[in-house]
Amino acid sequence: MKTTTALVTGATAGFGLAICKKLIEAGYKVIGTGRRADRLAEIHSQLGNNFLPLAFDIRDEQATINALNTLPEGWQAVDLLVNNAGLALGLEPAHKADLQDWYQMIDTNIKGLVTITRLVLPNMVARNYGQIINLSSIAGTYPYAGSNVYGGTKAFVTQFSLNLRADLAGTKIRVSNVEPGLCGGTEFSNVRFHGDDERAAKVYENVQSVQPEDIANIVLWLHQQPEHVNINRIEVMPTAQSFAGMSVSKEK
């Protein structure tokens, strides 16, 4: 029986690392990507030779092409692409936001995701086999103050996932979109608040949030469904989180 080859972007921490561990435990070979070559080397030493580190900046199209071209024999046909790499930067209102933060979110969450998808997909189509699992967010569905461009990028990911399904109709390639809510145990809020650990910690204070291992379990479950079953979307929140109420601003 052929071993499944997965490619997981943003593999150095959080969801990505948990997904890599879970897939390897299940017998997969995993290509883990990220910008931090030293961190990927550490993960390789922990997970063994079923983990192949691939260091590059997903925002850079040519770097992505070059990295994929270095894949050794036996690793070139990707059966499962997990588009996990992404970030949020800042929580300021739109008129105060840093444009560079906006550009970085667009380049990573949208440009990086579509680039690697476009590069991996033709081989899946040629084999009529594969699955793409995109990590989006409930921020792509439910607006909140300060989400502005971050929420916009995740709305793009969700709609792109659905449109991929339309493009791939008639093939055996599956596409799923995972939309997490409040998740702890990652670098998400530390990155969003530019390294302000105290502010980041307050986001998860006194809340039992979803953990990276929960998302990893969902990813594995999605891929292990029968080939004729495609789960289009999964929206997942901690039990403590619910839908935000509509904001009303009253005149003083």
From Swiss-Prot:
The keyword tRNA-binding does not apply. Gene3D superfamilies: NAD(P)-binding Rossmann-like Domain. Substrate binds at S137. CDD domains: SDR_c5. The active site is at Y150. GO terms for molecular function: oxidoreductase activity. It is an enzyme of class 1 (oxidoreductase). GO terms for cellular component: cytosol. It comes from the Bacteria. NADP(+) binds at residues 7-31. Pfam families: adh_short (PF00106). InterPro entries: NAD(P)-bd_dom_sf, Sc_DH/Rdtase_CS, SDR_fam. Keywords: NADP, Oxidoreductase. Its EC number is 1.1.1.-. The keyword Oxidoreductase applies. PANTHER family: ALCOHOL DEHYDROGENASE. Belongs to the short-chain dehydrogenases/reductases (SDR) family. This is Probable NADP-dependent dehydrogenase HI_1430. It comes from Haemophilus influenzae (strain ATCC 51907 / DSM 11121 / KW20 / Rd).
